[in-house]
């Protein structure tokens, strides 16, 4: 089953959106297999955003993600990477559709509430960066047969 990494950023945590965000993914039928509230170290932030290291906005990304608590999550399900991106919405909230998390809860690209992996390769990299294998709990909800055609 496909997995993706999501992180509720400090603005989402501070604004009390954690439960709402988790609920959206549960209601879609995805399974939460990893969850932790954490303070992100500069080292982890720099590794996570490493692809942007030479860009002018890199220091701002690192400073923001380390500015407060983050909820790191791993979700599992068919098509979870692409569908999570749809649920999250465009990176710039001004371009995000209403009904998406960013369309409903964010107004500034620098405070866009949530991060989600954008590809299977990045999902694997980010999951391995943020979680140890033993922190992930594979399980099958009783509702699986009501979500997926077997």
UniProtKB/Swiss-Prot annotation:
Subcellular location: Cytoplasm
Main location (coarse class): cytoplasm
GO molecular function annotations of the record: ATP binding; metal ion binding; nucleoside diphosphate kinase activity
Cofactor(s) annotated in UniProt: Mg(2+)
Protein residues bound to ATP: 9, 57, 85, 91, 102, 112
Active site positions, chain numbering: 115
Source superkingdom: Bacteria
GO cellular component, as recorded: cytoplasm
UniProt keyword annotations, A-Z: ATP-binding, Cytoplasm, Kinase, Magnesium, Metal-binding, Nucleotide metabolism, Nucleotide-binding, Phosphoprotein, Transferase
GO BP: CTP biosynthetic process; GTP biosynthetic process; UTP biosynthetic process
Keyword Protein transport included in the entry's annotation: no
One Pfam family it belongs to: NDK
Catalysed transformations (reactions): a 2'-deoxyribonucleoside 5'-diphosphate + ATP = a 2'-deoxyribonucleoside 5'-triphosphate + ADP; a ribonucleoside 5'-diphosphate + ATP = a ribonucleoside 5'-triphosphate + ADP
E.C. number(s) listed in UniProt: 2.7.4.6
Gene3D superfamilies the UniProt entry points to: Nucleoside diphosphate kinase-like domain
NCBIfam families: PRK00668.1 (NF001908)
Subunit structure: Homotetramer.
HAMAP family assigned to the protein according to its UniProt record, in alphabetical order: NDP_kinase (MF_00451)
Membership in a protein family: Belongs to the NDK family.
Function summary: Major role in the synthesis of nucleoside triphosphates other than ATP. The ATP gamma phosphate is transferred to the NDP beta phosphate via a ping-pong mechanism, using a phosphorylated active-site intermediate.
Protein name: Nucleoside diphosphate kinase
């Amino acid at each position: 089953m496909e997995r993706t990494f999501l992180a509720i950023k400090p603005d989402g945590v501070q604004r009390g959106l954690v439960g709402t965000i988790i609920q959206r993914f549960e209601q879609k039928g995805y399974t939460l297999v990893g969850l932790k509230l954490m303070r992100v170290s500069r080292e982890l932030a720099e590794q996570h955003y490493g692809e942007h290291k030479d860009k002018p906005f890199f220091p701002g990304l690192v400073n923001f993600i380390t500015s407060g608590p983050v909820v790191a999550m791993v979700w599992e399900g068919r098509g979870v990477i692409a569908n999570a991106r749809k649920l999250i919405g465009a990176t710039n909230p001004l371009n995000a559709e209403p009904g998406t998390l960013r369309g409903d809860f964010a107004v500034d690209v620098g405070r866009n509430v949530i991060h989600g992996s954008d590809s299977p390769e990045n999902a694997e990299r980010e999951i391995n960066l943020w979680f140890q294998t033993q922190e992930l709990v594979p399980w099958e909800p009783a509702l699986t047969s009501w979500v997926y055609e077997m």
